[in-house]
Amino acid sequence: MRYLYRNLSLVFVVFLWSCTSGDDIVDYSNLGPDETESGSTPGFNEDRNVYFGDLHVHTKHSFDAYIFGTTATPDDAYKYAKGGTIQHPLGFDMQLREPLDFYAVTDHGFLMGNVEWWADPNNTTPGTEPFTNLNIPENRTVESIPRRGALFATQVRSLVADFNFMGMVKYLWTGDQARVISIYDVDKHRSAWRDIIRSAQDHNDPGNFTTFVAYEYTSSTTRSGENVTTLNPFGTGPYEGGNLHRNVVFKGDRVTVEPFSRLKSLNPEDLWTWMDDLRDRGVDTLAIPHNSNGSNGQMFELENWAGYPIGKEYAEFRMRNEPLVEMTQVKGTSDTHPLLSPNDEWADFEIMDTRVGGTGWSRPDGSYVRQAYLDGISLQEEQRGNPYKFGLVGASDTHTGAISDDESDFHSKIGILDGTPQGRGSVPLPDEQVQLIMDNDDLPGARLIGLKKFGDTYYSNPGFRQWSASGLAVVWAEENTRDSIFNAFRRKETYATSGSKIKLRFFAGENLSDTSLSDEGLIKQAYSKGVPMGGDLVGGDESPEFLVWAVSDTRGAPLQRVQIIKGFAENAIGEPVGRPNEQVYDVACSDGLEVDPETHRCADNGAKVNL
């Protein structure tokens, strides 16, 4: 009887341990630097400094990054951001032209840390055999792409759909759907998350380099456009449809035991509810949607997840949790599209017109930030609130730990898959690679590469042929610390670049023209008389004045022009609510040129691209 009692006690203790809530909060301040008093760093500037960084970086803990050869750790990623050299999965060195000011590793919450475990030769879990020794040195070659493509396209999905009886018991006991999956190891998941947290704490250096604990919430909709609210262990739908991905950034040292992932819910509104609950418990976070361009029109809809028209409550709910949006990255620009901005001659800049993770066309309507701005204005006109009053950031979405934001040193983002010019379709394929693609054409995942023939020459024809070097998040903050930079995110004093370190200030207010541009106190007066980018200017009787200050990247090309794009609602005769509209204005020209008062455009200065 004593033996039976002891074993029952052991089972009970194990169940209690396994049921530790992933939403419990842990304080990791003991792992980071000593707390820094606000305003105490040497670079503190009450008029604010400009800081450049990236809030979208993947390492080996992301399932897709590991599948395509990445073994870089979070420590490697932060080393790279601070100017160090790390290796690409194909073996060449990667190093930035100059260090960044802040960085966040944002590995997928979905299956975080599990694929590396599947590849461990000591792992005997049934179903994981195809992953064994995936990233040992002799396997990290371009010849391994067909195998990796098949693992990505089908094997992960089939393993995620697999479940067993004990998994169902754990799910019913904990409410965590991840426990249903037979090959999902919660300990490996939590261990990887702790490694991400530990690394961010180790590399955070107030006044010099800022890190944030963060991860990616990888939600999506089905290809048909219908919403899927939960993972169905009895048979999932298409692996990827309309992209609804977000990066979730924690402000400080207090972090949850687990990230909230798609295995808990695909509904972004459930993520926001989770974030609201954390905020009530003293933990501030924000979510940053990305790649709306690949959302098939579903990132900026006028309905909520359940299909009801959105109103003020939804607008406040979303803005409280998503004050920023990622407007540009390697997978294209989400600013606007030629079909949405036909009068903007640069609306086709770095467009990716397919959905994320697939080759299907992504519907522009509802997929681009500028249209979301206009829809937000219309909703506000209808007294329904504005859920799309975003600040802007850029990012890389690198899956190698290393941002690739310079075309002269572009190594794309998915490791072995797109790490060579041949793989990206930039130069012809050698005969042996052509034969490799042909021989594996029937494998799942073959669509990731494909072939295209010009004359007698073959090129790869991948879905990522439209990708390009990008991008950076830029903030104006008093000092290079978590509190100061996160507060800048909150007030949306941010902007995006496609990779260059352009310095930009923008203010709106009244009587700004009374201040001389050469006045040493220009910025201080601009803050006192107006509001900076991201702020709300309360309407007055007079038209607002704008102050724009821009400086080119010292390592890049000169600036050709400065534009302001006006979004507004215009009432037609008999219409109670205005229709959204936009107008592009050039406001400053290079080379001493003047803006044409009729076209609102700068004259062509004859600048050419040196190819």
Residue ranges and their predicted role:
Residues M1-S9:
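Bacterial N-terminal signal peptides that target proteins for export
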Residues R254, K264-E269:
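Conserved, charged catalytic cores of large soluble enzymes
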Residues T20-P74, Y78-A81, T85-L134, S182-D185, ...:
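C-terminal functional module detector
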Residues N227-P233:
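Intrinsically disordered, low-complexity acidic/Ser/Pro-rich regulatory regions in eukaryotic proteins
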